[in-house]
């Protein structure tokens, strides 16, 4: 099964996550099919907290990919900010 989930990067006490499309059997930080965005939970100042390619996420969901709970909430957050910006 294909999943859209987070993979951790960054440094100790300073996490940074890539939002990736991967097979569910792969390790958390293992191989991925495509990178569709990133999430910085400790963003400060002008740094962006979430960057997500919504069109690619929708493409993968249409083709059967499952979202993890955190990615689903991030997608909702991005959609909300795009709606208010328009």
UniProtKB/Swiss-Prot annotation:
The keyword Ribosomal protein applies. One of its GO terms (molecular function) is structural constituent of ribosome. GO terms for biological process: translation. One of its GO terms (cellular component) is cytoplasm. InterPro entries: Ribosomal_bS16, Ribosomal_bS16_CS, Ribosomal_bS16_dom_sf. Keywords: Ribonucleoprotein, Ribosomal protein. Pfam families: Ribosomal_S16 (PF00886). Belongs to the bacterial ribosomal protein bS16 family. PANTHER family: 30S RIBOSOMAL PROTEIN S16 (PTHR12919), SMALL RIBOSOMAL SUBUNIT PROTEIN BS16M (PTHR12919:SF20). This is Small ribosomal subunit protein bS16. It comes from Xylella fastidiosa (strain M12). The gene is rpsP.
């Amino acid at each position: 099964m294909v999943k859209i989930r987070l993979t951790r990067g960054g440094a100790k006490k300073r996490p940074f996550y890539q939002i990736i499309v991967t097979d569910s059997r792969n390790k958390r930080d293992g191989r991925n099919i495509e990178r569709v965005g990133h999430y910085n939970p400790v963003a400060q100042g002008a740094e962006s907290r979430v960057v997500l390619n919504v069109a690619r996420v929708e493409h993968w969901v249409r083709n059967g990919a499952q979202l993890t709970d955190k990615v689903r909430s991030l997608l909702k957050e991005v959609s909300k900010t795009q709606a208010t910006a328009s």
